[in-house]
Amino acid sequence: MKINILTLFPDMFTPLQVSMLGRGLEDGKWDLNLVNFRDFTTDLHHHVDDTPYGGGAGMVLQIMPIKKALDSLPSTGKIIITAPQGKTFNEKMAQEWAKEDELTFICGHYEGFDQRVYDLADETVSIGDYVLTGGELPTMSMVDATVRLLPGILGNSASSVEESFSHGLLEYPQYTRPADFEGKKSARSFKPVVIIKRLLNGDTIRLLKATYLHRPDMLENRNLSDEEKKMLQEIKNEMNED
C-alpha cells in the first residue's frame, strides 16, 4: 500500500516511521509519501491561505496549491480529507481502507479548506467531536489504524483480528506476572457459574462483560445472537446481585 499525505508540517509524521510501522516501511510492506503543499505556491511569500469571501474570522486554505500537489502525484487512490464535519472514523473504515492499493490524505489547518477542496475528496472523515489545530494528528491516527492491518505489519497475524473493535466487542481485562502486586490479584472477577459458561462458550462472555461495563453503546450496534443475549442477561443479573 502507498500512502500520500498532503500537509504543511511533514515533520509531524516522524512517529509513523518508528516501531512496527517503521519496520514495515523498511521492509517495503507499505510506502509513505509526504508532500508539503506549500511547495506548490507561486507567490513570493508562499501563502497557502487567504481571507474568506464575505468576511469572517480566520483564514481559509486555498485550492490552488492543494490541487497542484495532487496533480503532481502519479496516482492518488482514494482521497481523504480530515475535518470536524466528516463522518466518524472507526475500525470498519480502517478495514476497508486496508484493502486499497493507495490512499491520499489532505491535512487541514486554520479555518479549514475552500469548499472546492472538499469537492476533490472521496471521503471527509473526523476522529471525534472535538477540534484540533490541524489534520495531522487525526491523519496519523487513521494511518496507524489502517496500516497495522496490512499483512506482515504486526508480529502476530491473529492480533489484528482478535482485538477490541474488530469483532464489535471490547477485549476483556488481561494480566501477566506477578499474580499479586501490592495486594491486587490477577484473578478474574467472575462467579463459578459464569466461569463454567465461559469454558463452554470460549471468551464470548468475558468480551460481553467488558463491553457492557465500558462501552455499552457498542452493544446497541451489534446483532447479538440468542446465546449472546442470554449471556448478557446473566451478566446484568450478576452485577445487580453485587
Curated annotation (Swiss-Prot):
Query: Which compartments is it annotated to reside in?
Result: Cytoplasm
Q: Which domain of life is it from?
A: Bacteria
Query: Which residues are S-adenosyl-L-methionine-binding?
Result: G108, I127, G128, D129, Y130, V131, L132
Single Gene Ontology MF annotation: tRNA (guanine(37)-N1)-methyltransferase activity
Q: Please give the Gene3D superfamilies that the UniProt record associates with this protein.
A: 3.40.1280.10, tRNA(m1g37)methyltransferase, domain 2
Question: Which cellular component appears as one GO term in the record?
Answer: cytosol
**Family annotation (Pfam families):** tRNA_m1G_MT
Q: Assign the protein's first listed, main location to one coarse class.
A: cytoplasm
Q: What's this chain's function?
A: Specifically methylates guanosine-37 in various tRNAs.
What is the catalytic activity of this protein?
Answer: guanosine(37) in tRNA + S-adenosyl-L-methionine = N(1)-methylguanosine(37) in tRNA + S-adenosyl-L-homocysteine + H(+)
Q: What is this protein called?
A: tRNA (guanine-N(1)-)-methyltransferase
Q: What Enzyme Commission number does this protein have?
A: 2.1.1.228
UniProt lists the family membership as follows:
Belongs to the RNA methyltransferase TrmD family.
